[in-house]
Amino acid sequence: MKIICIADIHGNREAIKNVKEFAISRGIERFIILGDFPGYESFKDEGENLEEIKDVLNMLKNFKVLAIPGNCDHPRAVDVFNEFNVNLHEKIIVMDDLSLVGLGGSTPTPFGTPFEIGEEEIYNKLKKLIESVETDRFILALHNPPFNTECDATADGVHIGSISIRKIVEEFQPSLVLSSHVHESGGKTDKIGNSVIANIGPLMHNRIGILDINGDIKIELMKI
């Protein structure tokens, strides 16, 4: 089973069209969206924010989609996801012999974005979810990457990932951590123990990931 992973769309409809065409050309029917749907001009307006999310989901209506919110998405994005039957936020979805565990939002930013969560809340929510996983293997689908990896460094080399997510990864060792959020680290991977960390990168710049679940779990990051 192959799944296209995208994130940080930020209102770029042309990028959605491109990835749809790519998916069709590869015969891939599934998407995981790791948040940040709206453009930078509209994310602070609740109505515009939610409409942009609906627009993207309508554009991908012929695919099987799962989604979490990013920090630029309004908290009511979860209501939209439920309306479209795509919600992965604070959910566990079993695929074959593994579980997909989703948590959206990010740690606080300097920009006052609508979906920001404190470190303690992130840790508690993820711990509770993971302790309910019944399969031997699981994947974390997050917006925020863990702290101090190749996947969370800004252009200045400052690491801005979540300390709590790193602690969760160290404690529970998921097979794979999907993330985005830090655009400058898009397309990079790293490891924490045996866990592979991947920053999918911003779809607004045509970056995607292809998750391949076929016994082994593999992630291929690319620009289309």
Language-model-detected regions and their locations in the chain:
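Binuclear metal-dependent phosphoesterase catalytic core
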Residues: 93-97, 117-118, 166-172, 185-224
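Short, conserved loop/helix-junction motifs that constitute active-site signature segments
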Residues: 26, 57-62, 133, 169-172, ...
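Active-site environment of divalent metal-dependent phosphoester hydrolases
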Residues: 10-14, 38-41, 69-78, 108-111, ...
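Cap/insert and terminal regions of metallo-dependent hydrolase folds
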Residues: 33, 38-56, 145-147, 151-182, ...
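Active-site neighborhood of phospho(di)ester-bond hydrolases with catalytic His/Asp-centered motifs
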Residues: 5-7, 31-36, 64-71, 87-89, ...
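Conserved catalytic scaffold of divalent metal-dependent phosphoesterases
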Residues: 24, 42, 72-161, 223
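Active-site-proximal beta-strand elements of phosphoester/diester hydrolases
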Residues: 1-10, 97-106, 139-143, 196-201, ...
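Core catalytic region of metal-dependent phosphoesterases/phosphodiesterases
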Residues: 13-95
